[in-house]
Amino acid sequence: MKKTKTYQVFCIAALSVLTLQLINGSSAATPPPPNSNSSTSCNRACGGVSIPFPFGIGKDCYLNGWYEVICNTSTSGSSGTTVPFLSRINSEVVNISLPDGKKLYGVVHIKGPVTSLGCSSSSSSSQVSEMSLPNLNVTGRGSPYFLTDENCLVMVGCGTKALMKDIESEILGCESSCEDSKSSEEVTNSKCDGYKCCQARIPLERPQVIGINIENTSATRGKEGCSVAFLTNKRYAPMNVTEPEQFHAGGYAVVELGWYFDTSDSRYRNPLGCRNMTRYSSYSSFDKCSCEYDYFSGMSYRICYCNYGYTGNPYLRHGCIDIDECEGHHNCGEGTCVNMPGTHSCEPKITKPEKASVLQGVLISLGVLLFVLGILGLYKFIKKRTRIIRNKNFFKRNGGLLLKQQLITKNGNVDMSRIFSSKELKKATDNFSMNRVLGQGGQGTVYKGMLAEGRIVAVKRSKVVGEGKMEEFINEVVLLSQINHRNIVKLLGCCLETEVPVLVYEYIPNGDLFKRLHEKSESNDYTMTWEVRLRIAIEIAGALSYMHSAASIPIYHRDIKTTNILLDEKYRAKVSDFGTSRSITIAQTHLTTLVAGTFGYMDPEYFLSSQYTDKSDVYSFGVVLVELITGEKPLSRKRIGN
């Protein structure tokens, strides 16, 4: 008896030291939760047992010392086998599970000790009690563990009783006896109800277990033999009477410990993103996890779990992931399973009549689409055909047939460099914008344009002309197509597809000679020296000489004046505007036409005879020479009195 009291004092002292350590360990601040992808370097399994956070193996892989797991090499199993141990309580781990919606605390199953009496040769005749070491003291201050109500005290043996004790007194116990009157079959099939086996439930209000004591109640200890007692989960408790030697040989019993993780610290709880819940409140299927208050052993705490439809670890950021209910067995039957966040839905299966309706709808939609596309195609075809017919009519009206006739008459000597489309010229001149106008004359308006290849051109859009004046336009085209002289503006091409005919010339950047002689402005900064005036006169004379003598057919300009003399970038003279020009054959000395030209530059004999000759162009050139020398206009009100 004295030995028993001494042992109890030793247990109390050991428990006091352990309690002080727990108090110190519990004062540390709760660290922030790790990310679900941040602990990939941590080993999360040992000996086939999954080790989820807050448990962990190795530094920085567990929450605190209570959750540290040590992966040791087994001494009893095969070579190289590892087994997990909870460091603080020095117990081998069987499995660990996280809280869920059904059970608000986590569960860890450990291997607990088996207390025996009379099961070895050394103690087979002993009459004293035997007590297990206090290694089930898992519920001290700061400990997250507690014995769940799924455990019970089991004793197997004859003439003995088992007592479970805590730091204060005995908590509970049970007693078994053996009767020789029962047959062997009755013993094997009997339940653990007092005959050779007894068990007792553990009250949750007294959870601090120090050890299990076995005492002999029989006067003949040697006859009763081996007895064992242990704590175990009810699932592992013996359903039928089993020989105590089997439990003694096994050396352990599976004990269920509940564990909680106090997340009342908002610094830890908020990053989890879990919804705060109260008991029996509802949550959305989009809420992956929930946290709620619970109460145990005089202390309230908050615990988290993955909601229904999600799985994973609620103590990790983004640790709860959606369960795809459609992958495995589902309750949709013949319907189609559609996975959704936290749940799933069953869509009705499309039957054959419904398929026919869908196919019919698709065909109708396709038919309508093809009909609309056909209408659009027909509209584009008609529009294109109309444009082609309109362009042909414009070509015919603008003298296209007359131009072809002229080409045949000239034996193919006309070399048209390019035929422009109306679309191309509209783009080049911004649809003949007024901002692009370079000048206007008796024959039309000239626009500045830029072709697609970047070349700057002058686009002359003729005024609306009747069929009687169409010959003048074609005449200008034919004449300029024959001319190839550096002092005559070159025709680049024409367009007859527009409402009015269009000619495209090379662009002459410095305007006409009239402005240089008579208009004083900041832009006219070029000095018209005598050398320049002489050079311009020579260049004009050369151009007239070419037209009168060197061209394949002699050409009379009939409107030589300073406004028709353009200046290029080097201020070289370029004769332009051939709208009133005429070509003559060798047998024809003159043409009788309407009066053409500009007053002040016209030959007086032309008024009397109406016969225009090369001398008429020379007379107009003489007026230009006087204009170059004197700087005076041919007609001036200042000279009327003189």
From Swiss-Prot:
How does the protein's chain sit in the membrane according to the entry? Answer: Single-pass type I membrane protein
Q: Please list every transmembrane segment annotated in the UniProt record, as residue ranges.
A: 358-378
Q: Which residues are glycosylated?
A: 37, 72, 95, 137, 216, 240, 276
On induction, the UniProt comment says:
Induced by INA.
Membrane side Cytoplasmic: residue ranges: 379-642
Domains as described in the record: The EGF-like region is specific to this family of proteins and seems to consist of the C-terminal of an EGF-like domain fused to the N-terminal of another one.
Q: What does this protein do?
A: Serine/threonine-protein kinase that may function as a signaling receptor of extracellular matrix component.
Q: What name goes with this protein?
A: Wall-associated receptor kinase-like 6
Q: Tell me the organism's taxonomic lineage.
A: Eukaryota, Viridiplantae, Streptophyta, Embryophyta, Tracheophyta
